[in-house]
Amino acid sequence: MADRRKLVMIVDDDQAVRDSLQFALRLEGLCVHVHNGGAALLADPSLNRAGCVVLGDRMRQMDGFTLLNTLQTSNPGVATIMLTSHATPRVRARAEAAGVWKVLEKPLLDNALVDDIRSIVGA
């Protein structure tokens, strides 16, 4: 069984984002599950073991904020990092109010995400 702190869930409807994040995080020794949307994440039986959920804000079938609301009920306390191409003050404030640990703007050009996940999961 994976160490809860080191299980990272990635949810984004952009396959290139999922693939690149999965590759980078696995290089760091983290266990990573990827999903193409909120429904797929919520159906993953190992969600209750996740130390961190990285999610996009503008996914087609279930946007990131709707997913956050569901996660707060089903998995309270799981750390979330939101990825957005539109990091406006309004989006940041809404994410903060929803309990997001951090908002990062795409494209991710440095190791900020990896460093943040390391802080969350203790890796």
Outline where the language-model segments fall:
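Acidic, metal-coordinating helix/loop segments flanking the phosphotransfer/catalytic sites
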Residues: 34-52
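The feature encodes the CheY-like receiver
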Residues: 18, 60-61
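Active-site residues of response regulator receiver
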Residues: 56-57, 84
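Non-catalytic signal-transmission and effector/linker regions of two-component phosphorelay proteins
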Residues: 1-9, 15-16, 22, 73, ...
